[in-house]
């Protein structure tokens, strides 16, 4: 499977016709048909319904089409960014993040980075905390903002702060009648929605460990992939969900209460390659220090 096959398939999917797609790609139709056939053999399922006019996508083909567009778009971004760096037009800083950090330190930091380094091309990549460590080692990102501690000697990490946790409750829950901090033991027996389902360890494990430390046994535990799904299920009254306090603004059709419990917090951790002294890594760390020095209580509601 290669990028050429991706481009060929996308052309056929858009044109819904092999002849027009071949003309657009400036190739003969037989080689185009052969490459699509090889692609289908490699993925193991049909992607096109050829005996219809126009050509139709199978369900698998629609999924592959959406993913192929994303892959090709990402490749184009990589090529453009690489050319800019090679021509010394712009420098690139790739930042990995978990979604919940977008509601805390990250937006302010990005604005400051652009102010101090307007020549910098900042690329944001959403990755789970565990994935960030691998991406840093592989050079796919330069900095990561996550929530899980690690032991990789090749990656340096700093805990920016310990963020308080909150519980998202259905509006009709008896616990939603109050807004005071919720004692963690009141979560005993509740249907609990945790995220992410994978990769592990992750934020879900932090939540379960906190409950275990307080000898709290939830009822049914449902695992989902991301915080947006979890909060949607809370709104639909499928259960409750523990989230970082900064994420309380994500939905307004659920009720939030801070959690009152020993070490009921989640760290916000910034990571980068060990011994990386590049100027933009140094600038990022400097700006973070300045932000906390200027506003030591700027996350009061979260700390």
Swiss-Prot record:
GO terms for molecular function: DNA binding; DNA-binding transcription factor activity. Residues 1-58 form the HTH lysR-type domain. One of its GO terms (cellular component) is protein-DNA complex. InterPro entries: LysR_subst-bd, Tscrpt_reg_HTH_LysR, WH-like_DNA-bd_sf, WH_DNA-bd_sf. It holds the Pfam family HTH_1. GO terms for biological process: catabolic process. Residues 18-37 bind DNA. Keywords: Activator, Aromatic hydrocarbons catabolism, DNA-binding, Transcription, Transcription regulation. The keyword Secreted does not apply. Belongs to the LysR transcriptional regulatory family. PANTHER family: LYSR FAMILY TRANSCRIPTIONAL REGULATOR (PTHR30346:SF17), TRANSCRIPTIONAL DUAL REGULATOR HCAR-RELATED (PTHR30346). Probable positive regulator of the cat1 operon which encode enzymes responsible for the degradation of catechol to acetyl-CoA via the beta-ketoadipate pathway. This is Probable cat1 operon transcriptional activator. It comes from Acinetobacter lwoffii.
């Amino acid at each position: 499977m290669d990028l050429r096959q991706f481009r060929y398939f996308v052309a056929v999917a858009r044109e819904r016709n092999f002849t027009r797609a071949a003309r657009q790609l400036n190739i003969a139709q037989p080689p185009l048909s052969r490459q699509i056939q090889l692609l289908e053999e490699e993925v193991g399922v049909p992607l096109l319904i050829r005996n219809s006019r126009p050509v139709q996508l199978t369900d698998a083909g629609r999924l592959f089409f959406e993913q192929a567009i994303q892959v090709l778009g990402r490749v184009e971004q990589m090529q453009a960014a690489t050319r800019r760096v090679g021509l010394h037009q712009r420098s690139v800083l790739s930042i990995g993040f978990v979604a919940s950090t977008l509601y805390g330190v990250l937006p302010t930091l990005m604005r400051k980075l652009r102010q101090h380094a307007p020549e910098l091309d900042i690329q944001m990549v959403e990755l789970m905390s565990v994935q960030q460590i691998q991406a840093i080692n592989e050079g796919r990102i330069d900095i990561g903002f996550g929530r899980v501690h690690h032991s990789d000697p090749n990656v340096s990490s700093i805990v920016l702060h310990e963020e308080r946790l909150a519980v998202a409750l259905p509006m009709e829950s008896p616990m939603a009648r109050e807004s005071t901090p919720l004692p963690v033991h009141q979560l005993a027996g509740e249907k609990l929605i945790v995220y992410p389902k994978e990769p592990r360890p992750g934020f879900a494990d932090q939540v379960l460990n906190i409950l275990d430390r307080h000898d709290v046994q939830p009822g049914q535990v449902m695992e989902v992939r991301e915080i947006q799904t979890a909060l949607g299920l809370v709104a639909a009254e499928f259960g409750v969900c523990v989230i970082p306090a900064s994420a309380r603004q994500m939905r307004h059709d659920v009720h939030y209460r801070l959690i009152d419990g020993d070490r009921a917090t989640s760290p916000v951790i910034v990571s980068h390659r060990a011994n990386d002294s590049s100027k933009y890594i140094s600038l990022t760390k400097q700006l973070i220090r300045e932000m906390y020095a200027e506003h030591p209580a700027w996350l009061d509601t979260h700390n």
